[in-house]
Structures are given as C-alpha cells and as structure tokens.
Curated annotation (Swiss-Prot):
<dbReference type="GO" id="GO:0005524">
    <property type="term" value="F:ATP binding"/>
</dbReference>
<keyword id="KW-0963">Cytoplasm</keyword>
<comment type="similarity">
    <text>Belongs to the class-I aminoacyl-tRNA synthetase family. ValS type 1 subfamily.</text>
</comment>
<dbReference type="InterPro" id="IPR001412">
    <property type="entry name" value="aa-tRNA-synth_I_CS"/>
</dbReference>
<comment type="function">
    <text>Catalyzes the attachment of valine to tRNA(Val). As ValRS can inadvertently accommodate and process structurally similar amino acids such as threonine, to avoid such errors, it has a 'posttransfer' editing activity that hydrolyzes mischarged Thr-tRNA(Val) in a tRNA-dependent manner.</text>
</comment>
<dbReference type="InterPro" id="IPR010978">
    <property type="entry name" value="tRNA-bd_arm"/>
</dbReference>
<feature type="binding site">
    <location>
        <position position="529"/>
    </location>
    <ligand>
        <name>ATP</name>
    </ligand>
</feature>
<comment type="subunit">
    <text>Monomer.</text>
</comment>
<dbReference type="InterPro" id="IPR009080">
    <property type="entry name" value="tRNAsynth_Ia_anticodon-bd"/>
</dbReference>
<keyword id="KW-0175">Coiled coil</keyword>
<dbReference type="InterPro" id="IPR033705">
    <property type="entry name" value="Anticodon_Ia_Val"/>
</dbReference>
<feature type="short sequence motif" description="'KMSKS' region">
    <location>
        <begin position="526"/>
        <end position="530"/>
    </location>
</feature>
<dbReference type="InterPro" id="IPR002300">
    <property type="entry name" value="aa-tRNA-synth_Ia"/>
</dbReference>
<dbReference type="GO" id="GO:0006438">
    <property type="term" value="P:valyl-tRNA aminoacylation"/>
</dbReference>
<feature type="short sequence motif" description="'HIGH' region">
    <location>
        <begin position="49"/>
        <end position="59"/>
    </location>
</feature>
<dbReference type="Pfam" id="PF08264">
    <property type="entry name" value="Anticodon_1"/>
</dbReference>
<keyword id="KW-0067">ATP-binding</keyword>
Amino acid sequence: MSNTEKNLPTKYDHMSVEEGLYQWWLEGKYFEATGDEKKQPYTIVIPPPNVTGKLHLGHAWDTTLQDILTRTKRMQGYDVLWLPGMDHAGIATQAKVEGKLREEGISRYDLGREKFLEKAWEWKEEYASHIRQQWGKVGLGLDYSRERFTLDKGLSDAVNKVFVQLYEKGLIYRGEYIINWDPATRTALSDIEVIHKEVQGAFYHMNYPLTDGSGHIRLATTRPETMLGDTAVAVHPEDDRYKHLIGKTVTLPIVGREIPIIADEYVEKDFGTGVVKITPAHDPNDFEVGNRHDLPRILVMNEDGSMNEKAGKYNGMDRFECRKALVKDLQEAGVLVEIEPHMHSVGHSERSGAVVEPYLSTQWFVKMAPLAEKAIELQQKEEEKVTFVPDRFENTYLRWMENIHDWCISRQLWWGHRIPAWYHKETGEVYVGTEAPADIENWNQDNDVLDTWFSSALWPFSTLGWPNEDAADFKRYYSTDALVTGYDIIFFWVSRMIFQGLEFTGERPFKDVLIHGLVRDEQGRKMSKSLGNGIDPMDVIEKYGADAMRFFLSTGSAPGQDLRFSMEKVESTWNFINKIWNASRFVLMNMDDMKFEEIDLTGEKSVADKWILTRLNETIESVTRNMDKYEFGEAGRSLYNFIWDDFCDWYIEMAKLPLYGEDEAAKKTTRSILSYVLDQTMRLLHPFMPFVTEKIWQHLPHEGESITVAAWPTVREDLQDTEAAAEMHLLVDIIRSVRNIRAEVNTPMSKKVQMQIKAKDEAVLAQLTKNSSYIERFCNPSELTIQTDLQAPEKAMTAIVTGAELFLPLADLINLDEERARLEKELEKFDKEVERVQKKLSNQGFVAKAPAAVIEGERAKEQDYLEKREAVRQRLADLEK
C-alpha cells in the first residue's frame, strides 16, 4: 500500500481515510497470530457479543480497549492472538426468532424443535455477518481465522465434557428449588435477565384465625394469591408478643387448611407485625425456612402463570385475576382488614417484560461452594492470582464468591446446549454422558438446555482447543493475558470463568481483568430504549469517523468508572485529528522527497530540535508506562499535549526558521527531525487511531509494509537533552507571557513593541542571547534588550518567569489601576503556591517517605515561587513610586 505521494489531500475526510484500510489489513494477515516461537505470546479472547442484533456503544468501548492493548503488544514484538467469537445467547436469541415467527403467525411449537433450530441458525448467520461488519468499521484487529461460536462443535464438546465431569464429581445435581420463572417464555431466568422496576402495589393485611378459636394473628403480603400455598406462619423465637403462640396452629382462610405457627430467626421482629406467611413453593426465603422446618411445598400455579388445581376454586385463573377475586373473597369473609398502598421493587423478564414469578421447579444445579473455595484460595497466591484493575473490584468479586448460592443451569428453551442427560422410558433411570446411550430407543433426552453463562464460563479455554490439552493453540496461548469487561458482569461471567478455568485447566483463565463502567448519556443516565437516549456507534463513525470515536471512548474515563458520552467531545477529537492532519501535510510538503535511509539525526541541532526530541522521549516513556497500567486516559492526554502543544503549536512554528532559511545542513536536520518525530508519534497514536495513523505513516518515509507491525517507539538516551529542554521551557514561558500581555492591552502580534528582558544571572543571559532569534520571531519586538542589570521602565507591563523578568513599555496603552490589579492577582497566586509547597515540606511524614528526588523537586519549586513572588512585590512597589 506504500504511498509515494508527498502530499496528503488538503482536507481531512474521515470517510475516505478509513475506506478500504480494514480490508487491506485483513488481506495482509497482520492480525493473525503467527505461532512464532521466538516471540512471547499475548492473548485476549473477546467477550462474545450476543448474536441478537447491533452492537452498542458499550461494545464499541469494550472492544476498542482490547484493540488498543493488542495493537500495542503486536508493535512491541509479541505474537498476539486476539480471538473473536459470538455467543448464542439462549433466551435472547430465541425470543428474537420467536418474535419474527409471530409476525408470520407461527409459533415454535408449530415448527417443532428441529425446524425451529434451523430458523435460529439462519438468524445467527445473518447477524454474525452484521457484527463482523461492525467490528470492521470500528477497526478491530481480530484473528478471524480462529473465530468461534458458543454452539460450534468443538465448544459443544467442551460443554458436554464439563457437564459430565461435574456430574460425576457430585457437583451437578437435579433438584427442586425456587428459581426466577418467566411465565410468558416459560423458562427459568438468571438474575441478570431480571430487571427490577419500582411499581405501585399494596400490602394486604389479613387476620389468620387461631384454630383453637382463641383469637387471630395478623400478617401482611404483597402477593395474596400465594397464600393458597401457605404451609406455615412464622414469628421470631425471641418475640415476646408471640412466644405463647409457637406450636399452635391457624386455619388458612378460604382454603381451610390447618398450618403451624413456627419460630424462625429469618423473621424481623420490628418489620410490620413481626409475623410472616410461609409459602415454600413461591418464595426463595420461605423455601429455606420450609427446609429448616420440614414443611410441605404446595405449588399453586402452572408454568404459564395460571392457577392450578391446588388453588381450589381459582383453578384456571390468571395469577392477577386470581389476586382480584381472592381479595374480594377475603374482604367478604372479614379476613382482609386493610389494603395499604406500597411502592416496591418487582422483577420483570428482560426479554418478555412479564412479571417474574419465584417458582418451585425441578432444575439442574451446580454445587458452588467447593468450586468457589478454590477460586477464593487462588487470590491468596500473589504470583498466581487474577489481578483486578482497579483493585477494588477484587473485593467485590471475593464478596460474591464467599456468599455464593448454587447455580441453576437448566433453561426451558430449545436454542442452546441441550443437557446431556437421558431418562429411561420404563425405569426412570438417569444417564449422563458425552454420548447418547447405545440403546437410544429406550431413552428420552432431557428437553432443557444449559444456561448461556455455562458455555460462556468455558470461553477462555474452549475456544483454544480444550478439552484437547495437546491442541497447539491451547498449549501456546492459554492462559490468556487480559480480559476487558464491565463491572456489571463480574459475578455472572468473570467469576464463573475463573472457577471453571481452575477446575478444568488448573490455571487462572486470565492474568488481568480490566474493568470498565457503563456508557451513560451526558446527564449521567443509563442509555435505554425507554429514555430514547441510545446512540448507535455506527452513526458516530459515519459522522466523525472511527478514530475520533475510539480516542474519545478510550480516554474519556479512568479504569472502573462510567463514561458520559458526549457527541460534542467526539467532535473535539475530530478537530484534534484535523490538526494532526494539517501538521502532517506541512511536514510532508517540506520533506523535499527525503527517503527513509536519508533521515539523519546526527547533525547539529537547535535548542528547539533538542527540546522536541527530549519531549518525544518523555512522551514515549509516559505513554508506554500508562499503557502497561491500563491508564489509557493518561496515555491519551500525554499524546494530546505533546502533539497539540509541543509539536504543532511550538516545534512546527520554530522549524519554519531553518526550513525557510539558507542553511542546507540545518534544513536537512530539521526535515529529519520532523519526519522522525511524526513517525514515532503516529506509532504511539496508532492503537488509539488506527486508520488516520496508517494513512499518514504510509506517506512518510518509512520501512515496512504497515504501521500495524511497525516497532513500538522506545526512549533513545542519545536524543535526551534536559538542559536544552529547560532552555526551551524558558523561551516558551517568555513567548507565552508576551502574547498574554499583548492580548490584555489589545496589541496585535503584528504591531512591533519594545521588549526588555532582565536575566537572573549570566547563565540565563547566555541562554537568551543564544536563542534570541526565536524571541524576535515569535514576540516581534521593535527592539530587544537582554541584560542582567535592567531597571524596570515606568509604566511597563511586566511578567515574571523562571529566571527572568519581562518588561514591555506600553505607556500609552497601560492602565495603571488594571496593571496593579493584575499584579496583585499574580501575588495572590504565588502566595498560595508558596504556602502549599512549604506545608508539604513541613510535613514530616512526606519528608520521611518521599524519594530524595521528589523532595529536591519541591524545594526547587519553593525557591522558584519565592523568587517570582519577590519580583511581583518589587513591581508593585515600583508602581507606587
């Protein structure tokens, strides 16, 4: 692709810059892991998006961070594998496919299981193609030769093997439990698929009569229809109000069933009346109480949310119709004494919107305690543990693991990994295996499929060839180096990958977990359909380009924090890229057909040359260090400041002096430095902005085919010159101060004015005299005087910089009162700085713990501020004369 044109197009057009580049990268196989044994492997597996539709901004953010990591590591010489893939997303995909069928007037039952699954696979192929297109638009450097899908044969084999082995170890069992039940889709839901909403409900206060006729006991419920399944009433064992009733019975209203009054510490004495109804088949807490007291479990609902025969005369009614009818009957019977309005949180199915029912069901479960124990123990081993970034999320993870419940893994769906369990048609015997029974005609396979998170938990190793532990990719690329994901799925996904990885590979599945937050709108609200504040990343790319979106997403927040999305800030990033483009055009137009081998940094350098090379070194160090710490925002800020301020605003302007001069050697050195600095900067920026950096780099004198595989910049000690950097800082301070003064008195830079500089000592005088051409070029003085023994002229505007004082005699333009006010403001600023640094230096803890270089730096600051403050005081005194 190498482009020999020296000029970039006049205007930056993100669409033309980004067009075709991704396909060119893919054709060059730059993203494919090589297996080169001379290189150290670096692996990331992409968190697989659901094959349910479009990727959102959260995906764009998450994958951009991974792309930054993998592009950086590839340039640093690693054998990088970034493995792509997608998740079948059980209930989410099935709901979409069923919705599409409903539009055609068909249900999945009309089609039957096999035909329905064919439709689901068609959906998968269509949407997988959309997702790949979106990945390409974002510019993700994925190794498509290794793309995986959670229902691939290899991954399905891994799922079956894990299920069977856990079953054989007694860690998978089948039993009754209260699960989240969606009556609309008729399946169990994981907690993450339940959305809690505040709804207006009521407390229904009822009197349950004591069977012996001695009175009644009052309680309240928000779900009166479940009382039909009550099997006890509970009070706290230490509640003096009810101690005498423990062991007695009440008669369940309407039903007439006699149920016991039991004592259990689950009851809160101070909440309500201190009495609760116990319905073990319809409430998870009641289920636990029922187990402790050996209570019967009476299920009064069907799977579709209608009442069953156990509900007596309400049999066949919808649960909410039953509630109305039952409340009316309770009122007429004098049992219901009060209906108290009550706002409370109610779980709704994320997919169907139906109110979720806590429901007693026979399901498959993973026994979590033994698995969690190993994962907790791992975190005590410093060299082997999973490192969370930020580290506060390790506590979140451990807290969940320490309080873990058994995991319901069966789902009443068709789309997914079918549970590898069969039931004998005659004996009811259960067979679990990776292969079907030999006499399959005598067995029925379990109809349920596994929770999507079950296969996702195996993702880091199943994608690399496990259970074949001799698979080349598994041996080379496992365990992986980093996982990038949101804090909202630490429990649902991260924790499960860790315990499954430990159980089946004996290793952590990843070394580091980089946690990011959620993308919110500018007001800090979560993006949602109901608020209408969602933004399609493809729309952002169309308007401003992938590079602008990526840079904003990756630098807009610190690790673990939420990101407030702002289209205005994306536009600002586009403006930044436009500035880079224009600066690159200037550099390329002044290359004079320079070839890569002609770049020579050994010639005599100006102070500006030495300074920009030193600043480049500092930027390389800062960006590399922050990338290693996952501080992409800090790395981005270092790059932004270097490119915008140092390179574009200062060095390019200063480079015009030799470029437009007569000294050919100086021209060659300047061209070499411009080319070198722009090349190195494009490499540093490439992981953030892959498209524009490739485009510019291809126009620069370069070696190699693509910037994607160009070497990552390293600090060059031979180009480091801290003295020159200090000289340049003084020049920049002087030029900035003069510009500020001119702006204050509305004197344009084109108007020549007298300028006097009082140097602090002979060394500063020598520096300023040597570099006076820069001062003359950028300050435009009619006359420049630099001395060590200058007296401040009357009615002069003043600026104090480190090592010098500036005087601009602007007698006709100066307002003495305004100048006095300005200097007093300066004095106040230096007073605060002196106070701050002296407070720091008087802190014994700081002095005892801080490195000597840091303390020395603070003392140097103190001296500098004291000198500047004294100079301001002197100028104020002069104004009073």
